[in-house]
Amino acid sequence: MNVSRCRIIAVGKVRKGWVQEGVELYLKRLPGLTVVELKDSSREKEAEAIRAALRSDELPVMLMEQGTPLASIPFAQRLERLGNERLAFVIGGADGLTDELKAAARWQLSLSPMTFPHELARLLLLEQLFRAQAILQGSPYHRA
């Protein structure tokens, strides 16, 4: 897994200090990972901004409650199988993603069957990306 080939496209700012601390911690642990932060707006305007932010060479991974849930090891294995594919993990705003964006996803991922605020979803995704990297490198960080 090459995190420099991954981006997170997220609607909304991280407003809670404790969440921002966690985000900064994992971004330091994942050098090369980029976060593109988009402005909160209507769902349709957010979808337009997401489409504009996506690169043509990226595989869009939409984070959504109805997506496929994966435990940490299968998540790491899937990232490893994707090899050098460029990935864009997309986190929608408070109203979620449009049906059009969901349909355009090559991969629909669920972090949990529960719903989280978008800023918390960003932190959870960063931690899971770090954990996936640790699993693939044989690091003792993952102790399941």
From Swiss-Prot:
UniProtKB keywords: Cytoplasm, Methyltransferase, rRNA processing, S-adenosyl-L-methionine, Transferase
CDD domains, alphabetized: RlmH-like
A single cellular component GO annotation: cytoplasm
Gene Ontology MF terms in the entry: rRNA (pseudouridine-N3-)-methyltransferase activity
Main location: cytoplasm
Gene3D superfamilies: 3.40.1280.10
EC identifiers of the protein: 2.1.1.177
Annotated residues for binding of S-adenosyl-L-methionine: 92, 111-116
Ubl conjugation is among the record's keywords: no
Catalytic activity entry: pseudouridine(1915) in 23S rRNA + S-adenosyl-L-methionine = N(3)-methylpseudouridine(1915) in 23S rRNA + S-adenosyl-L-homocysteine + H(+)
UniProt-listed InterPro entries: Alpha/beta_knot_MTases (IPR029028), RlmH-like (IPR003742), tRNA_m1G_MTases_N (IPR029026)
Pfam families to which the protein is assigned, alphabetical: SPOUT_MTase
Subcellular location: Cytoplasm
Top enzyme category: transferase
Xref: HAMAP family: 23SrRNA_methyltr_H
Recorded family membership: Belongs to the RNA methyltransferase RlmH family.
Stated role: Specifically methylates the pseudouridine at position 1915 (m3Psi1915) in 23S rRNA.
Subunit structure: Homodimer.
Name of the featured protein: Ribosomal RNA large subunit methyltransferase H
Organism: Synechococcus sp. (strain WH7803)
Gene: rlmH
